[in-house]
UniProtKB/Swiss-Prot annotation:
It is a multi-pass membrane protein. Belongs to the TVP23 family. Keywords: Membrane, Transmembrane, Transmembrane helix. Its main location: membrane. The keyword Transmembrane applies. One of its GO terms (biological process) is vesicle-mediated transport. This is Golgi apparatus membrane protein TVP23 homolog A. Disulfide bonds: none annotated. The chain crosses the membrane at residues 32-52, 54-74, 123-143, 150-170. One of its GO terms (cellular component) is Golgi membrane.
């Protein structure tokens, strides 16, 4: 009888732990500053680009401002927010022979690692996917309206944000070089379905799974 009570207590404790982990993953944002800047620079670049003609007649000033915001967004997403929000990181390395290698790192799942929250993962991927699509719309609208002076800026926006999207998809897919076969399904699942919290792990400098190309 005593052993049965002990077993019941252990089962209840185990379920309680699972409920705590589930509640944590569904908790509110744990990295508010990183989440804010993940969206701030890219949204600010879009808003500035759209409203430039309304608030300023200086093409050069608008061009420099939008390009600065795009550059800050590229750096912060590549070096900070991806590592903090979803535990992914990509970068380039030059070896001793002078050859360039692209490194794609993803935090390994371990019992000691803490998963990122669903809200952070969802914000990260949606912001990463939707904003380049908006710049693609700007590309066609600029082309068809013959505002060719803005075309270089729009191409820069597409290039910088698509580079981060491409790099993080490769991180997520384990550095799979055949990116064409997996991109479409990944994007559709990210946009239209709830992100799986177990897929996104808190970053760290240890236990990283590294893929080189």
């Amino acid at each position: 009888m005593k052993q049965a009570l002990v077993d019941d207590t252990e089962d209840v404790s185990l379920d309680f732990g699972n409920e705590e982990e589930l509640a944590f993953r569904k908790a509110k944002i744990r990295h508010p500053l990183a989440t804010f800047f993940h969206l701030f620079f890219r949204v600010s670049a879009i808003v500035t680009y759209v409203s430039c003609d309304w608030f300023s007649k200086s093409f050069v000033g608008c061009f420099v401002m939008v390009l600065l915001l795009l550059s800050l967004d590229f750096w912060s997403v590549k070096n900070v927010t991806g590592r903090l929000l979803v535990g992914l990181r990509w970068w380039n390395q030059i070896d001793e022979d002078g050859k360039s290698h692209w490194i794609f790192e993803a935090r390994k799942v371990s019992p000691n690692s803490i998963a990122a929250t669903e809200a952070e993962a969802r914000i990260f991927w949606l912001g990463l996917i939707i904003c380049p699509m908006i710049w693609i719309v700007f590309f066609f609208s600029t082309l068809f309206s013959l505002k060719l002076k803005w075309l270089a800026l729009v191409v820069a926006g597409i290039s910088l944000q698509a580079a981060n999207l491409y790099g993080y998809i490769l991180c997520k897919m384990g550095g799979n070089s055949d990116i064409g076969k997996v991109t479409a399904s990944f994007l559709s699942q990210t946009v239209f379905q709830t992100a799986c919290p177990g897929d996104f792990q808190k970053p760290g400098l240890e236990g990283l799974e590294i893929h080189q190309h």
